[in-house]
Amino acid sequence: MRVKKGFKARRRRNRVLKLAKGFRGRRKNCYRRANQAVERALNYSTRDRRLKRREFRALWIVRINAAARQNGTTYSKLVAALRKAGIEIDRKILADLALALPGDFAAIVKTAQA
């Protein structure tokens, strides 16, 4: 009697089809196309996790620079002054302060320049 590898193969296919949920067209229910689409999506997600960090850092720097210019300095001068004054605040927190609490950000700028 022929034994098919039914359970294992079905489980493998269902795992891929579950990952392809939400895809459009045949990519969501045709195993072969879904497998290719899932593989590509996983590659993109790996790449984009690194890109996300890069893009957020750039966004923080842009926000800090804009707020620093409103307070009469530039980003590079502000970072140098913060380092010289021994104030250790990371860019994410500085950007959040600049956006949410401009008065506190201005106080930090004054402290760094003093």
Curated annotation (Swiss-Prot):
GO molecular function, one term: structural constituent of ribosome
BP GO annotations: ribosomal large subunit assembly; translation
One GO term describing the cellular component: ribosome
Record-linked Gene3D superfamilies: 6.10.160.10, Ribosomal protein L20
Keywords for the protein's UniProt record, in alphabetical order: Ribonucleoprotein, Ribosomal protein, RNA-binding, rRNA-binding
Similarity remark: Belongs to the bacterial ribosomal protein bL20 family.
Primary role: Binds directly to 23S ribosomal RNA and is necessary for the in vitro assembly process of the 50S ribosomal subunit. It is not involved in the protein synthesizing functions of that subunit.
Name this polypeptide is given: Large ribosomal subunit protein bL20
Organism of origin: Anaeromyxobacter sp. (strain K)
